[in-house]
Every structure is written in structure tokens, then in C-alpha cells.
């Protein structure tokens, strides 16, 4: 019996290679349709919100934008924000910005807020938020330079300017939270939702 029972693949409203890999590893067939939305504009119009609320809003807006053009399809949106105290970070624009961000996070504990939403025909069928707390070790500037040289521009694709699934793990001394939350896709609640609705084998 196949694990995926829905008539059509799940639509992923994201260009994230990591999210795609997580879902495909769980035997979820995908149609990938990255959402084209103005994330910063949406945040501005929403006014003052918490990091978790921002992630949830953007996950919904991504799914909603793609679902509008795909009637009847299950569309998954996902987003992640990083907060250090009251400061919320966005993806670094370049390696220089990534370096400054990692220097700011060095030796401190920050939070990753991940959110997912499934929308079909404009209706929100499922929403979930999760938080992970990560503490960076006090690494040297020379280590930071070597890390960025090895990791390259890939770090700018992540809100944290690191990839814990790769060499970014060397930046940390403690991690609290679900691995999939850190990757930006809380997988277990999503799988539970899909099973409860008969779209995955139970």
C-alpha cells in the first residue's frame, strides 16, 4: 500500500531545497510552485507582530497566493523567522551581511519560529507553529571566516545564515527543539494532519 493516498501530489509553495528534500524523504509526492509575494510588504502592512505571527502570516500568504491559481489542490506554505530578543532577522543579503549576523548571534541564544499552513480553494485547512532555541558557541573570527568561505553563498538562503544540516552545526554548543522545526518545516504535525484526513496511510 502506498503511503500517499491523495489523488494528486501536494503542492509546495516554496523554492526551499531543504523543505522539498524533507517532504520527499517522507514519501510525499510534490508539485513545486514557489510563491511570488512581497514578504516585507506583507510584514509592514500587518503592523507590529511577534516572530511566530510573522512566520504564520507569511506561510498562509504563500499558500494562498499559489492556491488561487490551482483550484482543488492542497497547497503547503511554510516560513521561518529568527528572533534574538526583540530583534527579528531576515535572510542576509550577501556574505558580508551573513558575517555580521553570525557575529551578532555568537555566544547567544536565539529562537527559530517555523510555521506551516495548508490551504485549498482559499480555505485554511491546517496551521501549525513551532519554536526551537539554539545557542551559538563563542567561535573565533578566523573560524567564522573559514566557515563562510566553505559554505559560500548558500548561507544567504537561510534566515539564520547557517545550515545546521551541514557544516553550520559547528557554530553551536546547544540546540533545543525539533530538528524539522530548525529546517523550517515542522514535519510530524503535518504528517499527523495528512493521516487524519486520509491523504496518507495511517
Spans of features found by a protein language model:
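Residue-level signal for inorganic ion chemistry
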Residues: 23, 59, 79, 98, ...
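Active-site oxyanion/phosphate-handling segment shared across diverse enzymes
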Residues: 127-201
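N-terminal polybasic phosphate/anion-binding patch
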Residues: 1-74, 87, 142, 149, ...
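Short beta-strand-to-turn element immediately C-terminal to the catalytic PLP-Schiff-base lysine
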Residues: 83, 117-119, 137, 174
